UniProtKB/Swiss-Prot annotation:
GO cellular component, one term: ribonucleoprotein complex
Keywords associated with the record: Chloroplast, Plastid, Ribonucleoprotein, Ribosomal protein, RNA-binding, rRNA-binding
Keyword Ribonucleoprotein attributed: yes
Pfam families: Ribosomal_S18 (PF01084)
UniProt record, GO biological process: translation
Assembly behavior: Part of the 30S ribosomal subunit.
Assigned protein family: Belongs to the bacterial ribosomal protein bS18 family.
Protein name from the UniProt record: Small ribosomal subunit protein bS18c
Native source organism of the sequence: Lactuca sativa (Garden lettuce)
MF term (GO), any: structural constituent of ribosome
Gene transcribed to yield this protein: rps18
Gene3D superfamilies per UniProt: Ribosomal protein S18
Length: 101
């Protein structure tokens, strides 16, 4: 076989189709928090259609539902829940206070 013809041969690997993220019975609604929370990042941002693997219509409905939930304060606009903990290096010790006086 020629090299030029060999490049166009397809490999016969098995292809597993992914399940759709939204089933036919799921209702896209601002009250359905379990469904909506799957399409929001850790920072509270709406994930893109490419990441979600949604259709255009589904992405539009998800976006509207997320925005409605934010307005009704069911979802936060930003998710900045950082735990600020003092480490030993940042805490002041009594010996440091005594020296400054």
């Amino acid at each position: 076989m020629d090299k030029s013809k060999r490049t166009f041969l397809k490999s016969k690997r098995s292809f597993r189709r992914r399940l759709p993220p939204i089933q036919s019975g799921d209702r896209i609604d601002y009250k359905n928090m379990s469904l909506i929370s799957r399409f929001i990042s850790e920072q509270g941002k709406i994930l893109s259609r490419r990441v979600n693997r949604l259709t255009l219509k589904q992405q539009r409905l998800i976006t509207i539902a997320i925005k409605q939930a934010r307005i009704l304060s069911l979802l936060p606009f930003l998710n900045n829940e950082k735990q600020f903990e003092r480490t030993e290096s940042t805490t002041r010790t009594p010996s440091l206070r005594a020296r400054k006086r």
